Amino acid sequence: MAEQNTQQDLREILQIRRDKLKALQDAGMNPFEITRYDVTHHAQEVKDNFDALEGQTVSLGGRLMSKRGMGKVSFCDLQDKSGRIQIYARRDEMDEEAYNRFKKFDIGDIVGVKGEVFRTQKGEMSIRAHEITLLSKSLQPLPEKFHGLTDKELRYRQRYVDLIMNPESKRNFEIRSKFVAFLRRYLDNLGFMEVETPVLSPIAGGANARPFITHHNTLDIDMYMRIATELHLKRLIVGGMERVYEVGRIFRNEGMDTKHNPEFTTCELYQAFTNLDGMRILQTTLPYKVSTLASPPNTAVVYGMDTVVYRSMPFLSY
């Protein structure tokens, strides 16, 4: 019964939002027409430089995440890629027609805000809005704010909603991007060359895993999506490239859960004229250097039931 009520409520919300969209279009306003908005600052940038920006006019773009008030004074939270900031809107400080339109905006709408940086009586860093422009209308409601998007299945299948509702997920994306960029710089500085090897191969080799199989129409042969980058990288070493690596996607037609995806990224590298000790140097220094991207050096990181402290340590032989 509760699920039926939830579905009914969702249908009603969707219909209300479609009605608002139609009303805008009937009034000659296309909420998807604006393709450019001049953003001068981001939310966290305003907060970090509040003393210098206080009293100045800035422009921000982002998603409405909450709305409060709706009389002569309204408050809302604007979220952009850097975080959230409060927007303060007064009817007597905006065009009255524009203010009335703003009151009909929904949570999830993409808006542009132009206004003055100031601090409210309660001390909240805010933007006193002069203009609030609807840039894109949201027809689908966001998960309610108190519980957010907690269903793991939905979080992984609708990652775009997860990114909106869970700052930690966005943080993970940022850390991964920094990690891959750092990894490339680190290996490049050691004289390694990044290469791209074929994703499709007539044989499945380099690892013990079940491959995905596809058919090459022109050659009329079955081919395999790679389960490792090993074979082609070794051929490059044979060809005279002394240090090579690849950050690439791997495909293994096996089990799937929240920590095991059939499509994933690896970094595989090979170097000539060295031995096990040469690879040990990379093994002992690279994890420590990479760990500092996510936390300060020597920080304890809790992983499951274990506590891990990454330090630069010498290799111990037994």
What are these regions (language model features)?
Residues M1-Y318:
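Class II aminoacyl-tRNA synthetase catalytic cores and aaRS-like
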